[in-house]
């Protein structure tokens, strides 16, 4: 994103971090802020920022694969990226077969996670009217907080999970949290879905 903003848009490098933070706070994503304030072409932006050698960053995780294969749930990807990038990521991780649909930034346009409108669109696409029957896993606390406020069973995953946070502990930001994929089935069994 920094390269796009500097090279394609001519924004001075020293202004980029401040603008990214401002747009993220005000619009939910840097992209939505760039759309609102700079009339950026969404497809050009997405193509540029997603042109990455995923194999250098992402590697299949056998535990993640095993857990996802064991889930009796209908799984969707809900992302602020576009569907082609999400598919590339799923293929790289070798987990594409475990997801039935992708709700991407284009399908929720002009909204994005973590807005209520985006959650409602995703819920409609999932074919569910009751958010309490759905769980959402995300790696950002502000997204899990919004998901929980919307009525979803919100699960925080990854490096944002505080080390002292037990899997069953409650927080205003989430209903549950995990760092190890093998913990996910137990968390889903504890959900109200």
Q: Model features per residue range: what roles?
A:
Residues 1-65, 84-87:
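N-terminal helical cap/lid subdomain that shapes the substrate entry/recognition surface
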Residues 63-73:
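A short, Lys/Arg-enriched amphipathic alpha-helix followed by its capping loop at the start of a domain
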Residues 69, 76-78, 82-83, 87-193:
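Asp-based, Mg2+/Mn2+-dependent phosphohydrolase catalytic module
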């Amino acid at each position: 994103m920094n390269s796009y903003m500097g090279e394609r848009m001519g924004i001075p490098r020293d202004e980029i971090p401040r603008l990214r933070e401002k747009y993220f706070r005000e619009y939910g994503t840097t992209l939505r802020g760039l759309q609102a304030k700079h009339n950026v072409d969404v497809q050009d932006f997405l193509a540029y920022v997603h042109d990455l050698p995923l194999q250098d960053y992402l590697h299949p995780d056998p535990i993640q694969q095993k857990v996802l294969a064991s889930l009796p749930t209908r799984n969707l990807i809900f992302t602020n990226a576009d569907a082609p990038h999400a598919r590339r990521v799923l293929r790289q991780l070798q987990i594409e077969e475990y997801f039935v649909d992708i709700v991407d930034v284009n399908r929720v346009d002009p909204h994005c996670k973590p807005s209520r409108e985006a959650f409602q669109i995703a819920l409609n696409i999932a074919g569910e009217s009751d958010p309490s029957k759905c769980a959402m896993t995300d790696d950002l606390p502000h997204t899990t907080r919004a998901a929980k406020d919307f009525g979803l069973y919100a699960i925080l995953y990854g490096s944002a999970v505080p080390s002292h946070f037990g899997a069953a502990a409650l927080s205003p930001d989430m209903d549950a949290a995990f760092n190890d994929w093998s913990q996910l089935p137990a968390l889903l069994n504890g959900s109200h879905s």
